[in-house]
Amino acid sequence: MALDLPLSDFRKMAVEEFDTKKLLAHARKQSIDRGYDKFPIIDVDSHHYEMESFHEILEFMDDPVLRQLAMSAAMTAGAKGNGVMPGGVGYQDMGGRVTRYPLRKIEKGDAGEHRDVSLTKRWMDAMGIDVAVMFPSPMLQLGLHPQVEVEVELARAYNRWLCEKVLSQEPRIRSMLYLPFNDPEASYKMVQEFGGKPGVVGFMVTSARFRPVQHNAYMKTYALIEEMNLPLAFHAGYNWNEQSMGMMNRFISVHAIGFVFYNMVHLTNWVINALPERFPKLRTIWIESGLAWLPFMMQRLDNEYMMRSSEAPGLRKLPSEYMRDMFYSSQPMEMTDMAALECTFRMIKAETQLLYSSDYPHWDFDLPSTIYDLPFVSEEGKRNILGGNAIRAFNIKLPEKKLARVA
């Protein structure tokens, strides 16, 4: 099947097929040249486009009324599932220049396995990734759904579908499952149901939402995740419909600020309300916010705390010290000023706390070379960031012989 790409009024392109392996040929060459086969590489934040399997996912909904409403809306609206999922305004394909956005739809999977498994393995093999932690894409907006019951039903359906259709087929693919955070009791039950499933390495809260993480209703969920020795992640996102973000008139602006803003709010509440003291063994991961905001937060919170420590009586040390014990995903790593980046690495103890993430197949993804080629990180530090830290954060056990990759 050919797909016409409307690149401009003057130039059009008809594409007969799309192959991830060809797209990432240079990434494959990098992985060979740099010898990635000599140490584990774990990608803690990759994505798939679950809307391309949306009708499959809806079959896993329990509520027959909501299932019928969702199926009808999805059938009417098409693959994006508009009418079911909250809309996210944005121009991630940069006016058609990032061609894999439309072209991925015509890429075929391999016989005998789910298409999501095939496509994921192709980019993993090209980049030299041993294990990838997979997240949804449009569903990162699900926390903004006006109907809490719909968020809960879709979250449970997606989690069940992912475990049965994807994670069970390929041990190299793992996931931190979606928690419907607008319903604290449903979140708790989600951890109970899925905490021991194969391929589940933790749980994830989408950050673009308006529920305070310090609310007492979530304490038993945090306690259960801690008891299971699993990490909890806050995955960043943006919401252009939010009033303060609506003042920005360009996608570049809301993408730059939105992906940082919500995690800044949640991390502040997490630290100031002493949740690291209440759950000292619960590992927290802050995903897809980049790194440049962290020195600012450390300095800002420390400065306020030194003047008003009575308002954070549960803390036993500076906010920055709690932050240095947390984990952070690397992408999108701000590399415009190497001196500033080196300072950031030092402040967050990157060699033990930073986790490599690609964010593939999103438009601003980072290859492992983003970490491997840094001039100021030791060889041991690079290997820690690319895989060793994730093994510790997720308790991932790799076989003695590294997982085979396609040559």
Residue ranges of each PLM-predicted region?
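Divalent metal-dependent hydrolysis catalytic cores, especially in the metallo-beta-lactamase
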Residues: 41, 46-47, 103-110, 121, ...
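Mid-to-C-terminal alpha-helical segments outside catalytic/metal-binding sites
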Residues: 2-40, 55-131, 160-168, 189-192, ...
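Short glycine-enriched, charge-decorated loop/helix-capping segments at active-site entrances
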Residues: 147-152, 370-373
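Active-site metal-binding loops of divalent metal-dependent hydrolases
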Residues: 46-47, 359-361
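Flexible loop residues that form catalytic
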Residues: 47, 137, 208, 237-238, ...
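Short catalytic/ligand-binding loop motif for oxyanion handling, primarily in non-cytosolic enzymes
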Residues: 49-52, 57, 131-134, 140-145, ...
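Catalytic pocket-lining loop regions of alpha/beta-barrel enzymes
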Residues: 3-4, 153, 166-174, 179, ...
